[in-house]
């Protein structure tokens, strides 16, 4: 398996499996001189960790992070930063019924056909458990971006199943388990999930992420465009089946006179481009949305086949999120932050001395 590393100058390599002794990552390319403690990382991991409400998996993992290297006396040294998170609440016996059978909608069948071996315990390497190290690395990226450029990366749930969640205020996002920016709609979301759990079924969600304060100029055309790398990173998150930048698929029905964001001395009029033009950041907010499919592990019996190709019925008994989108907000934030820090360093390496006579206009004229 060779696709375990994200990034070019700021790289993150993850390791581990869902039911192994530990999971973690190695971060290479983090600039030296930044203050960093385990507490800086833990606060982000706590936002993602399981067992925090009745609406998510009841697997009880503390997700306590250990910094093994790359930090001396609370300051990054510029050497690789190794993060370790120990698994403490595995129940491998829950997966005994799928040793010879593939779960529909999971990576079981494809991993088996590609590698000729698979870890059936919780999906092994393909488990969303492996997003914890991504959030850990994302905490490092967020801190550097915030301190160096004033960049803030924030996300929220904008849709759960067929329930739209109108944005009200960022202050509500951290006050409920859904990362909803609308406190009034939380009871409806809770009732929806309670009914879904009784049905033994699952549902999908939409997560919106916004990066504010990104300077103009980040991105490496043609094949490492900023939006292309964002899309790749987001599609690397478990269960993500769609990514939109800016207006996204709504652009199809927009006329050019509407979609094209006009420029004025006071700033851009509109942000249908989502903060990226020609693969390069414009200085506006970078806006990203992801579509997350329903959890494939459900208690409803499903048709499948065995390794021998015989027909079988699969019913999943492990502890699973009825909607993986509920805990996906900090993961999506982290992925965006990892792409941004990588491109910040790449821009500094090649174009850090470039200056033009054109004023940098503000992100919005309104």
UniProtKB/Swiss-Prot annotation:
Reaction(s) this enzyme catalyzes, per UniProt: 5-O-(1-carboxyvinyl)-3-phosphoshikimate = chorismate + phosphate
Entry coiled-coil feature ranges: none
Lineage: Bacteria, Pseudomonadati, Pseudomonadota, Betaproteobacteria, Burkholderiales
Database matches in InterPro entries: Chorismate_synth (IPR000453), Chorismate_synth_AroC_sf (IPR035904), Chorismate_synthase_CS (IPR020541)
Name the record gives this protein: Chorismate synthase
UniProt-listed SUPFAM superfamilies: Chorismate synthase, AroC
NCBIfam families: aroC, PRK05382.1
Assembly mode: Homotetramer.
Species in which this protein is naturally found: Burkholderia ambifaria (strain MC40-6)
Function: This reaction introduces a second double bond into the aromatic ring system.
Family designation: Belongs to the chorismate synthase family.
Keyword Nucleotide-binding included in the entry's annotation: no
Pfam family, one: Chorismate_synt
Sequence positions that bind FMN: 125-127, 238-239, 278, 293-297, 319
């Amino acid at each position: 398996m060779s696709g375990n590393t994200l990034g070019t100058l700021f790289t993150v390599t993850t390791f581990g499996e869902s039911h192994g002794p530990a999971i973690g990552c190695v971060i290479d390319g983090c600039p030296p001189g930044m203050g960093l403690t385990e507490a800086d990382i833990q606060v982000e991991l706590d936002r993602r960790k399981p067992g925090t409400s009745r609406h998510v998996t009841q697997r009880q993992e503390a997700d306590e992070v250990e910094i093994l290297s790359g930090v001396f006396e609370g300051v990054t040294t510029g050497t690789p930063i190794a993060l370790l998170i120990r698994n403490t609440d595995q129940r491998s016996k829950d997966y005994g019924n799928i040793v010879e059978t593939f779960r529909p909608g999971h990576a079981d069948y494809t991993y088996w056909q590609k590698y000729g071996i698979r870890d059936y315990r919780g999906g092994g390497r393909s488990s969303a458990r492996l997003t914890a190290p991504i959030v850990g690395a994302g905490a490092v990226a967020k801190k550097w971006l915030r301190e160096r450029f004033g960049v803030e990366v924030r996300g929220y749930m904008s849709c759960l199943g067929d329930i739209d969640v109108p944005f009200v205020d960022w202050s509500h996002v951290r006050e409920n388990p859904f990362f909803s920016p609308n406190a009034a709609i939380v009871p409806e979301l809770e009732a929806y999930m309670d009914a879904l759990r009784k049905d033994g079924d699952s549902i999908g969600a939409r997560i919106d992420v916004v990066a504010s304060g990104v300077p103009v100029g980040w991105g490496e055309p043609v094949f490492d465009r900023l939006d292309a790398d964002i899309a790749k990173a987001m599609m690397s998150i478990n269960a993500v089946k769609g990514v939109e930048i800016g207006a996204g698929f709504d652009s199809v029905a927009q006329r050019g006179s509407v979609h094209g964001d006009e420029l004025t001395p006071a700033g851009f009029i509109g942000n249908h481009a989502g903060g990226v033009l020609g693969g390069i950041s414009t200085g506006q907010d970078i806006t990203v949305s992801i579509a997350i499919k329903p959890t494939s592990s459900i208690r409803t019996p499903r048709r499948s086949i065995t390794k021998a190709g015989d027909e079988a019925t699969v019913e999943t008994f492990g502890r699973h999120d009825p909607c993986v989108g509920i805990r996906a907000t900090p993961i999506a934030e982290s992925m965006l932050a990892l792409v941004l820090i990588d491109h910040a360093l790449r821009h500094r390496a090649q174009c850090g001395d470039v200056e033009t006579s054109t004023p940098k206009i503000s992100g919005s004229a309104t």
